[in-house]
Design a protein with these regions (language model features):
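N-terminal intrinsically disordered/low-complexity leader segments
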Residues: 1-19
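C-terminal peripheral helix-coil segments that are non-catalytic and often amphipathic
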Residues: 1-7, 101, 108, 142-157, ...
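Generic hydrophobic, amphipathic alpha-helix propensity
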Residues: 20-29, 45, 71-83, 148
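Helix-turn-helix
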Residues: 23, 31-66, 70
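Short hydrophobic clusters on alpha-helical segments that form packing/core surfaces
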Residues: 24, 28-32, 106, 203
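Short helix-capping/turn signature of helix-turn-helix
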Residues: 61, 122-129
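Hydrophobic alpha-helical connector segments
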Residues: 70, 84-116, 169-173, 196
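Amphipathic alpha-helical packing segments from all-alpha helical-bundle domains
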Residues: 77-85, 112, 121, 131-158, ...
Length: 209
């Protein structure tokens, strides 16, 4: 995955430092996606990034926790920006419309950023890693259901949705998207657009007044 160098330069780094840092983050994302979180080592990241030494990783991130924080922040920003851009044409006050856009866009994200989705799954499964970033579980949970649950709660208060449990519906949507991700990983020929539409239809009926 190509990481935006500009976001690294904002940390006050030189162009060379920002480029190397972005290169390491991108290589870590690719390594986790290919080998899984547990088998991702500095040695594998070094090889993937084409670095001369693992010491370059330690120089930029100090330890595994710092690297994983940067990786998760990058993936989170990528997904949040993707969802935001793909939902720009929907009226913010149209709660059902925003719910549909969220579901369809979340499914489309699987196709456009498969490595990011794999990283989220892997990091969620290893959130208790002692050497990892302590806030991993909280951040992944927020990305998976936090914003969606707030959207559902607001829609229920406004009368846009029926008498639903926002927490249960948000979790159900997240798990449904996980199911699509698993199906897509097993068979890349699946029609993700159709999956997105049908899931959106399903939850539109489930949340209707």
């Amino acid at each position: 995955m190509q990481v935006n160098i500009d976001t690294q330069a904002e940390l006050g780094l030189s162009v060379t430092e920002a480029t190397t840092r972005a290169q390491i983050i991108g290589a870590t994302i690719a390594t986790i996606a290919d080998h899984g979180y547990a088998r991702t080592t500095f040695a594998r990241i070094k090889e993937r990034a084409g670095l001369s030494s693992t010491r370059l990783i330690s120089y930029h991130f100090t330890n595994k926790a710092g690297l994983m924080q940067a990786v998760l922040s990058t993936v989170s920003e990528t997904k949040s920006e993707y969802l935001r851009e793909r939902s720009e044409g929907v009226d913010p006050a149209d709660r059902p419309g925003n719910l549909r856009a969220y579901i369809e866009t979340s499914v489309a994200f699987l196709r456009d950023y498969p490595q990011c989705e794999r990283v989220l799954v892997e990091m969620a499964a290893h959130a208790d890693d002692r050497d990892g970033w302590a806030m991993t579980g909280v951040m992944v949970g927020q990305l998976r259901t936090g914003a969606l649950q707030r959207q559902l709660e607001q829609g229920r208060k406004e009368g846009a949705f029926g008498d639903i449990s926002p927490e249960i519906v948000a979790l159900s949507i997240a798990q449904a998207v996980d199911g699509v991700a698993a199906a897509y990983a097993a068979d890349p020929s699946v029609d993700l657009d159709r999956y997105g539409r049908e899931l959106a239809d399903l939850f539109a009926r489930a949340t209707a007044r």
